[in-house]
Amino acid sequence: MSEPSAAVGQRPGGESAPAHRLWGGRFTAGPAESVAALSRSIDVDWRLARYDLRASKAHARVLAAAGLLDADELAQLLAALDELDRACASGTFQPAAADEDVHTALERALLERLGPLGGKLRAGRSRNDQIATDLRLYLRDHVRLLVRRLVDLQWALVDQAERHLDLPAPGMTHLQHAQPVLFAHHLLAHVAAFARDVDRFRDWDRRAAICPLGAGALAGSSLPLDPHAVAAELGFTAPAANSIDAVSDRDFAAEFAFAAALVGVHLSRLGEEIVLWCSQEFGWVELDDAYATGSSIMPQKKNPDVAELARGKAGRLIGNLTSLLTMLKGLPLAYDRDLQEDKFPVFDSLDTLLLVLPAMTGLVATMRVKADRVAAAAPAGFSLATDVAEALVRRGVPFHEAHQAVGRLVAWCAAHGTDLSAVDDDQLAEISPYFTPENRAEVRTVLSVRGAIGARAAYGGTAPERVAEQLAAVRAALADSAAWADAAP
């Protein structure tokens, strides 16, 4: 067995490796240079090499079990595949410039090492079921890495929430002050969004865990191969039940792209808030120097580029999903060469998230919350108005009338430049007959931020005891998600 070549596309002696194709018997000439260039995908799919080798080992074993390889041939093939796997991992084997795709490069390497025996491995399989298998294997591994990164970000948000458990903040709708909440409650809302992302990826894995290998080009194989054995060895739950669907299905790729795009949307929303929070107008957080940048002309600037780039890359992730769905929408069964384009958007979405998530995690973990500024903003904008209305409801006033009465109270305060808590009893009585002495006493109990927050004690609300419950549930869920991410598929 020869040593792997040290130079890309060259034999050990230095001469160029001839073009190797997995097809061509019926052709009298090779493809035009422009066609070869158009067809080539090796620069994109080479990252699948070790997964292709892993699938090849499983395929070699079922060939042997079917009597199509003897014990010595199987041993030689497995040894060559192991050696090639090490060479790919170390980078000592690289594809040649003329290799069309990952399958071509690896078969060429086997033929160079084993001669005709290397060609026996292709029996009973096609590039169609190979690539579908490789891509599923690759994504199932890397989705767990994504989930781990999402868990890290959620922990950063949880840590900030725990450091500011008692900090009141203005809850907003339409970016206007609405009702006071705990800042921890707000951060946990982002945790909830990312938790759904984790759940989506975990649910995606259940559907992606179907093995296409054995489907051949589209119709299955006439050879007595055992697809259940291949599926089990590769960590799949079952082989594909329909060989045509096995090679044509890219739902798993589209679902991945959707889940990735939604992560991007959630990162963008978090990023947008951080951009606002660190502005002079809000002044709620100070970014760590390691997670901010400056200006080439304005010396005073400290820019939230990490948050802005996360926001910007959401469009890229959405575009990848659109690209993939548009490519898939008109394809007749079974395999079409259009499917070669599935890897560009999928890999880009994966790479983008693996780039953004650690940076956003560091940004969140290191940002300093200016608690005084946040707390001071909590009661602004008549944010206790709903609490006043609900205090009247507890006293038996229909909500419609309570809403009208408090609306008049807010209008009076706005006209007189004062706040709700500053209105005296006589003024309340003049504003609405519903502000009776008994009702006024109830209203006074909620005219504080702490009182209003404490009153929101329904399940899922912002009262301190409810937020503590949310934190406990989140910690348990994160531990479970981390365990799933760290386990092999």
From Swiss-Prot:
EC number: 4.3.2.1
Leader sequence residues: none
SUPFAM superfamilies, alphabetized: L-aspartase-like
Record key words, sorted: Amino-acid biosynthesis, Arginine biosynthesis, Cytoplasm, Lyase
Cellular location(s): Cytoplasm
Major subcellular site: cytoplasm
Protein's pathway: Amino-acid biosynthesis; L-arginine biosynthesis; L-arginine from L-ornithine and carbamoyl phosphate: step 3/3
Entry keyword annotation includes Membrane: no
GO CC field: cytosol
Keyword Amino-acid biosynthesis: yes
Reactions mediated catalytically: 2-(N(omega)-L-arginino)succinate = fumarate + L-arginine
Superkingdom of origin organism: Bacteria
Alphabetized GO MF terms: argininosuccinate lyase activity
Family to which this protein belongs: Belongs to the lyase 1 family. Argininosuccinate lyase subfamily.
Protein name: Argininosuccinate lyase
Organism: Acidothermus cellulolyticus (strain ATCC 43068 / DSM 8971 / 11B)
